[in-house]
Amino acid sequence: NGTTLAILLSALFLMSTLGTAITMEEDTEIMPAAGRDSSDIRISEILVSASSEDYNGTDWNNDGYTGSSSDQFIELWNSGSEPIDVSNWLLDDSPEEGSAPCRLAWNTTIEADGYIVIFRDSSRIELDYFDPDSASISDANGNLIDSLSYPAEDSWWDTSYVKDLSGTVTKVS
């Protein structure tokens, strides 16, 4: 009956809310949305072109396929001293062209000086091999937090772009 379903759904919602409140009482305090310094979140590394097994490539996402396009990744780094909740933030490539943005999952927290890696197979963000492209991260309100761009025809096999705190981008393999 419809009334029973409505009561059941309301109870489940309340239980999930209580579960979140209990979880948040652990030793690690998560910076709330209003208090976090979102400028501490940076795109620290991207891999555009994974090398195949024939060329000693790496299976970056451990899915059993070496050099597949699913091995492309974007790495986020929390350069700050407090954990930051990045739930509902948007990861994107070139906004005018390119892939649809990827909304980060609920309850996604990057620990202080911690990293998370988002692979193409889960984000559906396709970084371009031949044309210039960029990766960007925006907060839940759409404010651009950081980006990393690279030029056309510059992606080497199994070589990623790394950005340091000063914003300098270099290639590493």
Which residues make up each language-model segment?
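Activation on beta-sandwich/Ig-like modules and their edge loops
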Residues: 22-171
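Secretory targeting signatures
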Residues: 1-35
